[in-house]
Design a protein with these regions (language model features):
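C-terminal ends and interior cores of transmembrane alpha-helices
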Residues: 88-102, 315-328
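Juxtamembrane intracellular "pre-TM" segments in multi-pass secondary transporters
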Residues: 2-14, 204-242, 433-435
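Helix-loop boundary and gating motifs at the non-cytosolic
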Residues: 4-65, 98, 103, 236-284
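Hydrophobic core of transmembrane alpha-helices in multi-pass small-molecule transporters
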Residues: 25, 93, 103-120, 246-247, ...
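Cytoplasmic helix-loop-helix junction between adjacent transmembrane helices
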Residues: 111-152
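Transmembrane alpha-helix termini and helix-breaking/packing motifs in multi-pass membrane transporters
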Residues: 39, 44, 97-99, 156-186, ...
Length: 435
């Protein structure tokens, strides 16, 4: 398939970024359509916070088990086939959740979510970064990743606002089950996910491989995995980035799981009043967009570089989580959510920049998968332990614990700043030569 010229050309920085921004933005839109009411959909179907937390923990454990092998497979056989299988598994998971009535369906949702998440992490981002680095001129990775972040958070903003409002807007339409209640938001996300799979086939161009070639390359996966694990230990910045990634997992799952139950203490949890969740979804989406825009515009000028920016964002995020937990009024929820998601955006881009700059192209997917692995270890910890705390005590207490953990691990970025990156690149070459 010939590369498209003009706006989506693979021969220019703008074209490569536009292509990935379109794909990742629509994918983010599909994710966020159901997300503002996802936990409410589960509780509406009869699941309590302990069961929901357990399901999220199952998802995280599966990601932990599959993350590294599937990352190695993406490096071995190509990023597009892995991305497509990931999208299909995630599509099936939300289809199951749409029809969920009992624990078995909820667990199947968690299983396919875990498979999809494990396959997803790193594949398309690795394709994008490699395409950028293959250009004939030098580009700013942090600025381009921030541009992608803008596209993703703009899509998140639209998805959260629309998905959070759909149940209220259509509450008088007498939709059939399972579209009634909060189900309509999940259905809208499913439709968009199908379109994203089509776009992945069209936009993610890779060299054609025959079946025998794919099989031969798949057999190299164990060597790729071994190489990646050795790099994770020997590149100086990697241990610190992995600690920060785990903390990011705890914070993210705490926010995603507990903000809706905390908000429901003030606003209630009926589909007819879901418009407020659409507004809150707009707030968190707009805040994430502002964070990405701030990094795109000023990130390269932040004193201390990407490590300092990520560390400061971690501290800000912890403070916002505590604010959200301790001030569950309308204003407290909105401000806490807004600042927390602003800080998530301003942490993610420099973190990803540090990671991508530290690893070699031929091992990019496996290294991104290892980063995702520790992220989901944090998700597993946050889902299981904090889910139990939320069910037995209060979701506000669980969120405070997540915030304190986030605050403590902010020091990981101090280690990143002190690590000798030039020596890390020499070690990359040494380990690659030994493989």
């Amino acid at each position: 398939m010939p590369s498209r010229r003009g706006f989506l050309s693979l021969e220019s920085e703008r074209g490569v970024t536009a292509r990935f921004a379109l794909l990742s933005g629509l994918q983010e839109f599909a994710i966020w359509l159901p997300l503002p009411v996802l936990v409410l959909h589960m509780t509406d179907r009869g699941f309590d916070l302990a069961a929901i937390g357990f399901a999220f923990a199952v998802r995280a454990v599966l990601v932990v088990a599959l993350e590294v092998p599937t990352g190695g497979l993406a490096d071995a056989i190509g990023r597009r086939p892995i991305a497509l299988v990931s999208q299909a598994a995630t599509f099936l998971s939300f289809l199951l959740l749409l029809f969920a009535l009992g624990p078995a369906t909820l667990m199947l949702y968690a299983v396919f979510q875990g498979i999809g998440a494990a396959l997803h992490s790193g594949a398309l981002e690795a394709w994008y970064v490699d395409r950028l680095k293959a250009l004939e001129y030098e580009v700013s990775l942090q600025k381009n990743l921030a541009t992608i972040g803008v596209a993703q958070t703009a899509a998140m903003l639209a998805g959260a606002a629309i998905g959070g409002s759909l149940p209220a807007l259509l509450s008088g339409s007498e939709l059939p089950w399972p579209l009634s209640g909060f189900g309509i938001a999940l259905f809208a996300g499913l439709v968009l996910r199908a379109f994203v799979m089509y776009l992945t086939i069209v936009l993610v161009e890779e060299p054609e491989r025959r079946g025998t070639q794919r099989l031969a390359e798949a057999l190299t996966t164990p060597a790729v995995v071994r190489d990646g694990l050795r790099l994770a230990l020997r590149i100086p910045v990697m241990p610190y980035l992995l600690v920060a990634g785990a903390a990011m997992g705890v914070a993210t799952i705490s926010l995603e799981t507990f903000w809706q139950p905390i908000a429901s203490l003030t606003f209630g949890a009926d589909p007819e009043t879901s418009g407020v969740y659409g507004f809150l979804g707009f707030v968190l989406g707009a805040s994430g967009l502002l964070g990405s825009l701030a990094v795109m515009r000023y990130g390269d000028r932040f004193p201390g570089g990407p490590a300092a920016l990520a560390g400061a964002s971690q501290v800000l995020k912890a403070g916002a989580m505590i604010l959200l937990a301790l001030h569950a009024t309308g204003a407290g929820v909105a401000v806490g959510l807004g600042v927390a998601f602003f800080a998530l955006a301003t942490q993610n881009v420099p973190h990803d920049t540090l990671l991508n700059e530290a690893v070699p192209s031929e091992r990019r997917s496996i290294m991104l998968s290892i980063n995702s692995l520790v992220f989901f270890l944090g998700v597993a910890l946050g889902s299981s332990v904090l889910g139990y705390v939320a069910a037995q005590q209060d979701p506000r207490l669980a969120l405070c614990i997540g915030a304190l953990f986030t605050l403590v691990t902010a020091v990981a970025y101090v280690g990143v700043a002190l690590a000798a990156r030039p020596r890390g690149k020499e070690l990359v070459a040494e380990v690659s030569d030994e493989a």
